[in-house]
C-alpha cells in the first residue's frame, strides 16, 4: 500500500458511480472509481471514507471491498436519511466526491496472519468486516481456518447473500454460517439470533474474532463468547458509526482519551474497557 499523507486524506477526490447493486430492499452497493477509471486511493480493511454530494450532504461509510481490488471501491449503503435516500435514487454515472482513507484498520498483516479467524456480523454490520474477509480470501495461504457467522431479520435482508452462500464456501478451509431471526417460507437454514447461534456453534477459543453489528447483538454475542472461554483481547470491533469529521477535529467522536476518527474505528474490546461507558 502506498503512503497516504494527511493532506491527501483532507482533499476530496472526484468519483464516478460505475455500478449499483441492489443487495436488499434497503441496501445498495455502489462501485466507484476515478473519472479516468483509476482507483480513488489505497486503503486497508476496516478503513472508512467520507462520501459527499454537493447540495445534498456528506456521510461516513465503511469500505467493504478488498484493498486488492484496483478496479473500483465499493460502498454498501443502507437507506436511512437524506444523503442515503438521495444515493439510493441515483443512476450509474453520478458524480460524487470521496475523502479518505480515514481511521485505522484491522491488523490483517501484523496480528491476523497464521491464525484461525471468526468473523461475526449482523445486518448492515457485515459491510465493515467484509473487507477483512475479502482480503483474507485474496491471500488465503496467509491465514488459517475462516468462519463467518452472519444473521439478519429475514433472508431478503441478508446482505451479500449470493456471494456469501455460493462463492466464499468454495474457498478451501472457509465456512459460512447464515441465520435469520424468524422462520419463513423458502428458508431451510438455521433460525435464531446471532448471539445464540454463536454459542450453539461452540467454536474453539483459539480463534481471533472480528465482530460488527447492532449494539444489542454485540453486547450479547460478546457475553456469549466470554462464556465459551474467549478473552476480550481476542475480539476486535469497529466503531465507524461514531466517526464524524474523519480527522479528529470536531470532537464529536471523542470517548475518554480516544478519538474514534484518529485512534479507531477499529478497537479490541480490552481497549474499550479502559474507556468511559459511552459507546
Regions found by a protein language model. Name each.
Residues 120, 267-279:
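Short microdomains enriched in Cys/His and/or Lys/Arg
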Residues 2-94, 153-154:
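Ferredoxin-reductase
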Residues 19, 65, 178-180, 237, ...:
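Structural signal for conserved beta-strand scaffold positions within catalytic alpha/beta enzyme cores
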Residues 3, 82-244:
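FNR/FR-type flavoprotein reductase catalytic core
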Residues 216, 240-265:
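Local cysteine-cluster metal-coordination motifs and their immediate loop/turn environment
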Amino acid at each position: 500500500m502506498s503512503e497516504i499523507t494527511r493532506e491527501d486524506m483532507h482533499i476530496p477526490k472526484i468519483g464516478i458511480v460505475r455500478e449499483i447493486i441492489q443487495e436488499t430492499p434497503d441496501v445498495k452497493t455502489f462501485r466507484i472509481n476515478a473519472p479516468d477509471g483509476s482507483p480513488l486511493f489505497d486503503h486497508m480493511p476496516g478503513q472508512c471514507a467520507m462520501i459527499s454530494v454537493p447540495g445534498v450532504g456528506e456521510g461516513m461509510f465503511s469500505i467493504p471491498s478488498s484493498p486488492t481490488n484496483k478496479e473500483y471501491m465499493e460502498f454498501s449503503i443502507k437507506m436511512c436519511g437524506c444523503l442515503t435516500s438521495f444515493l439510493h435514487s441515483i443512476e450509474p454515472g453520478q458524480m460524487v466526491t470521496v475523502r479518505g482513507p480515514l481511521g485505522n484498520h484491522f491488523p490483517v498483516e501484523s496480528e491476523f496472519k497464521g491464525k484461525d479467524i471468526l468473523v461475526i456480523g449482523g445486518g448492515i454490520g457485515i459491510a465493515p468486516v467484509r473487507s477483512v474477509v475479502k482480503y483474507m480470501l485474496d491471500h488465503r495461504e496467509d491465514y488459517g481456518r475462516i468462519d463467518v457467522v452472519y444473521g439478519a431479520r429475514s433472508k431478503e435482508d441478508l446482505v451479500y447473500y449470493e456471494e456469501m452462500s455460493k462463492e466464499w464456501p468454495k474457498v478451501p478451509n472457509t465456512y459460512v454460517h447464515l441465520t435469520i431471526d424468524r422462520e419463513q417460507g423458502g428458508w431451510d437454514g438455521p433460525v435464531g439470533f446471532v448471539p445464540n447461534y454463536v454459542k450453539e456453534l461452540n467454536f474453539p477459543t483459539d480463534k481471533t474474532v472480528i465482530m460488527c453489528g447492532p449494539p444489542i447483538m454485540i453486547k450479547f454475542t460478546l457475553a456469549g463468547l466470554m462464556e465459551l472461554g474467549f478473552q476480550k483481547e481476542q475480539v476486535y470491533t469497529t466503531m465507524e458509526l461514531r466517526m464524524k469529521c474523519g480527522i479528529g477535529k470536531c470532537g464529536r467522536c471523542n470517548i475518554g482519551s480516544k478519538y474514534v476518527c484518529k485512534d479507531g474505528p477499529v478497537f479490541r474490546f480490552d481497549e474499550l474497557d479502559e474507556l468511559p461507558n459511552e459507546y
